[in-house]
């Protein structure tokens, strides 16, 4: 029997899980595949002093930008944050703690945490500020940094379709960090655009098994914004 529970609204799926000071892994890459409705629910709930683990920090008033605007985030662990002016303001003023992490290292830290691996060594960041305060070890004449796996209190992710048992399908590049973040959370809450009957999805196309999904909600009103819309000149088409 599936342990995945289906909830009518995002706030119903997440409200009793949120507490001040918790660590939350958030899926998505830029604005692609972000759990928009669950982020809205977090803003509505008002939990504060959060540590957010995410590849990006959203943009102003979109995605995690909403939680930055409402001052709910105390610390962000991310690899790229350059498109959010409110993030910039809070970081430069000392209001926001930031841990910069190379993108591949961030993905592996979350994957390791989800797999029960406490840490791993990597050459990425040796000789840079990324290595500051971390254990260094030499293997075969090469220096490596010890990076710790990330295990969060909660993971929130976004998928395209799921069946009622939580087996999920992502749409193209919207898969991004969502799979990895799901396993890194003690509890995973997923939002999808469509919930289908158990057995109706092609088993060979399941990207995330339902064993990783504790709670499921069907979202609505997705704007699917494009961070940078670039088109060719008509003459070049």
Q: Where do the protein language model's features map onto the residues?
A:
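Conserved alpha/beta enzyme-core scaffold
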Residues: 1-237
């Amino acid at each position: 029997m599936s342990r995945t529970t289906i909830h009518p609204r995002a706030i119903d799926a997440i409200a009793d899980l949120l507490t001040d000071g918790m660590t939350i892994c958030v899926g998505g890459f830029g604005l692609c595949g972000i759990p928009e409705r669950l982020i809205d629910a977090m803003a509505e709930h008002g939990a504060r002093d959060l540590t957010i683990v995410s590849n990006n920090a959203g943009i102003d008033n979109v995605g995690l930008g909403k939680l930055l605007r409402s001052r709910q985030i105390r610390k962000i662990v991310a690899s790229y944050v350059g498109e959010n002016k409110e993030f910039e303001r809070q970081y430069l003023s000392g209001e926001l703690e930031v841990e910069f992490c190379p993108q591949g290292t961030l993905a592996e830290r979350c994957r390791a945490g989800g797999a029960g691996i406490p840490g791993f060594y990597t050459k990425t960041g040796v000789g840079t500020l990324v290595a500051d305060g971390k254990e260094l070890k030499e293997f075969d004449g090469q220096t490596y940094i010890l990076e710790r796996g990330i295990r969060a209190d909660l993971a929130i992710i976004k998928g395209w379709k799921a069946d009622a048992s939580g087996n999920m399908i992502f749409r193209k590049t919207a898969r991004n960090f969502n799979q990895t973040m799901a396993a890194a959370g003690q509890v995973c809450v997923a939002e999808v655009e469509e919930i289908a009957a158990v057995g109706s999805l092609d088993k060979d196309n399941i990207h995330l098994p339902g064993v990783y999904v504790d709670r499921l909600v069907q979202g609505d009103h997705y704007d699917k914004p494009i961070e940078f819309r670039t088109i060719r000149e008509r003459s070049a088409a």
